[in-house]
Amino acid sequence: MDPIAENILSDLKKEVLREVTREKASRFSRIVKNESSAKNYAKAMFDIASDIGKIEVIKSDLNVVYSSLLVDNDIFNFFKSSFIDGHLRMRILKKIYADKILEETFNLIAILVERDMINILFAIIVEYENLCNEYYNIIVVKITTASNMTDTEDMNKLKDHITNMISDKDIHFTFNIDENIIGGVVIEVEDVVYDYSVRRLLTELKSSISENN
């Protein structure tokens, strides 16, 4: 476990202090119109991060909070539960995080806890990272194979081909192993999936045989 997250987890289990004021959350309340939308929260957070020049710091803050909350189900359920006194949850939240993350990040977490929406934090982080990638002109390409092919000649050729196709972006490759695809490769570029797996070919073959019978 990350040392920062470990320290926070330890504190979360024992510390209580006073409630965070509603005034500190007011900026988010004005920006965010749709409480159920992680995209809106992420956009509000990113706009503020951009304004204060802390895009990467807030990105790190969000991941620290997420990892420290979710590492223990009891802690996560404590902050998620609407049956636990809101003032108590806020007091603990302030004691643990107020001096460890930026005030802007803390305000977002406080709003999520106050509105019983901490369960969408991961979705907010994903959307925030997407906005970061867009800002830095980064595109993430996920490559899935049935076995480890990261350093092979075939993989290097595939990466070169993709890089030539998307020459106007800074490409960040991620690699995943999934034995269920049997062979071949599955490439994900943003929301588009290019499935060249053996599994897909077998599925199509099976479907074709069924239609002809």
UniProtKB/Swiss-Prot annotation:
It comes from Brachyspira hyodysenteriae (strain ATCC 49526 / WA1). F(1)F(0) ATP synthase produces ATP from ADP in the presence of a proton or sodium gradient. F-type ATPases consist of two structural domains, F(1) containing the extramembraneous catalytic core and F(0) containing the membrane proton channel, linked together by a central stalk and a peripheral stalk. During catalysis, ATP synthesis in the catalytic domain of F(1) is coupled via a rotary mechanism of the central stalk subunits to proton translocation. This protein is part of the stalk that links CF(0) to CF(1). It either transmits conformational changes from CF(0) to CF(1) or is implicated in proton conduction. GO terms for molecular function: proton-transporting ATP synthase activity, rotational mechanism. Its main location: membrane. It holds the Pfam family OSCP. F-type ATPases have 2 components, F(1) - the catalytic core - and F(0) - the membrane proton channel. F(1) has five subunits: alpha(3), beta(3), gamma(1), delta(1), epsilon(1). F(0) has three main subunits: a(1), b(2) and c(10-14). The alpha and beta chains form an alternating ring which encloses part of the gamma chain. F(1) is attached to F(0) by a central stalk formed by the gamma and epsilon chains, while a peripheral stalk is formed by the delta and b chains. PROSITE patterns: ATPASE_DELTA. It is a peripheral membrane protein. NCBIfam families: ATP_synt_delta. This is ATP synthase subunit delta 2. It is found in: Cell inner membrane.
